């Protein structure tokens, strides 16, 4: 049986994660014009503020239901090198964007269900969606339950339910019925989506090589799905989110990678019975991204690798194309509001490549240069201020004890602003 694996929240900077609404390109890049308001610096970050209370919404990643997108921070700096981080951080959104003072720290001691009679040593965000349909986004986390290597391992996933004040109370273990399991692998790698088209969020998990578990929502507050059938066949073993309805048939679809690392991938189509149909086999690569790149009516796929990016247009038809730019890490969203996807490629640098009606292009690519030095990764690409334009959130870290998070606003003219509108450090979560 393979060893326990640790994964991160889908839609972040980890290589191999699938990100919705993506374009890609390569070529001369210019810095965007500075159209952002005066930044909120890390040193001037406000004191902790109460989490705004909401009444429920359909906005993604809205844990307090106030109609504004929130930011999940799965990696926080530590007071000393090599120390365990404090937990999972949430920075809450507003009509002005993210508010660093409105924050919440989810510690395993306070929020995790005990494993083996004690708080789990592992407590990491994996996926987020409204699993119980109450208008508040819920968080799927992974833990490290004890396992002696004999028989089926326990389910490591737990559900933290949102509320008017954000995630509240302890998480509950996710219930994966025996009939939905196959083999002796860890049930892991959760992907949210409405795969059966009934309007409720489901979860797809890895069951074993060649099998997926499909848990139909809505979920109870005890962590149980409405229904779960036998595992469904799959061409791979690593379901990858976020899901998307690529062919606009009312059923979410997802990419399943052959393994957790670089390699091949398959687009699996949803339907009344869930994600049971193979749509198209994608080329091997490091990362896969879905987006409205401009060709055809359906979504397209970009498959990134150090040697270039393979394009597959109008899925599942998958007309072929290519871009001669490295793309080992891909993130995406519509930053200029034209309805087409921009691609963010990161690794050695961060570039935003504009989408065009004929497909993604290298012309007019924007280089986003963080204000601080270090290792930079994309945390999120989404609309955090409600203006209809996606924003780009970057984290630059220098070792384990220093980092800076920057929010670059989307721009109809420049794709994203060169200067960050908001900056802060995750060290704010260390404060008592």
Segments (PLM) and residue ranges:
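Beta-propeller-forming repeat regions
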Residues: 2-432
């Amino acid at each position: 049986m393979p060893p326990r694996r640790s994964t991160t929240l889908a839609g972040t900077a980890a290589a191999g994660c699938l990100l919705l609404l993506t374009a890609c390109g390569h070529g001369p890049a210019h810095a965007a014009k500075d159209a952002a308001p005066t930044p909120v610096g890390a040193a001037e970050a406000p004191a902790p503020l109460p989490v705004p209370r909401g009444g429920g919404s359909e906005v993604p990643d809205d844990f307090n239901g106030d109609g504004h997108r929130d930011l999940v921070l799965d990696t926080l700096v530590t007071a000393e090198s090599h120390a365990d981080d404090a937990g999972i951080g949430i920075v809450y959104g507003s009509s002005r964007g993210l508010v660093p003072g409105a924050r919440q720290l989810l510690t395993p001691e306070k929020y995790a269900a005990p494993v083996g009679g004690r708080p789990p040593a592992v407590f990491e965000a994996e996926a987020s969606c409204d699993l119980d349909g109450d208008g508040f986004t819920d968080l799927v986390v992974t833990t490290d339950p004890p396992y002696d290597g004999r028989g089926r391992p326990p389910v490591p996933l737990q559900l933290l339910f949102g509320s008017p004040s954000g995630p509240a109370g302890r998480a509950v273990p996710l219930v994966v019925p025996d009939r939905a399991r196959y083999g002796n692998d860890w049930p892991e790698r959760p992907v949210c989506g409405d795969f059966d088209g009934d309007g409720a969020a489901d979860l797809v998990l890895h069951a074993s090589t060649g099998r997926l578990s499909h848990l139909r929502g809505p979920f109870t507050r005890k962590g149980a799905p409405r229904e779960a059938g036998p595992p469904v066949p799959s061409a791979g073993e690593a379901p990858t989110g976020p899901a998307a309805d690529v062919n606009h048939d009312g059923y979410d679809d997802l990419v399943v990678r052959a393994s957790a690392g670089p390699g091949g991938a398959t687009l699996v189509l949803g339907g009344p019975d869930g994600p049971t149909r193979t749509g198209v086999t994608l080329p091997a690569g490091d990362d896969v991204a879905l987006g409205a790149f401009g060709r055809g009516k359906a979504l397209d796929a970009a498959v990134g690798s150090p040697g270039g990016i393979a394009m597959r247009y109008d899925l599942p038809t998958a007309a072929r194309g290519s871009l001669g730019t490295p793309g080992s890490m891909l993130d995406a969203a519509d930053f200029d509001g034209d309805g087409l996807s921009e691609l963010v490629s990161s690794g050695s640098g961060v570039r935003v490549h504009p989408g065009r009606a004929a497909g993604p292009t290298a012309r007019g690519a924007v280089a986003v240069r963080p204000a601080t030095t270090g290792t930079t990764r994309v945390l999120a690409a989404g609309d955090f201020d409600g203006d209809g334009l996606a924003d780009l959130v970057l984290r630059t870290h220098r070792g384990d004890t220093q980092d800076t998070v920057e929010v670059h606003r989307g721009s109809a003219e420049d794709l994203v602003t060169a200067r960050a509108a908001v900056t802060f450090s995750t060290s704010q979560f260390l404060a008592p």
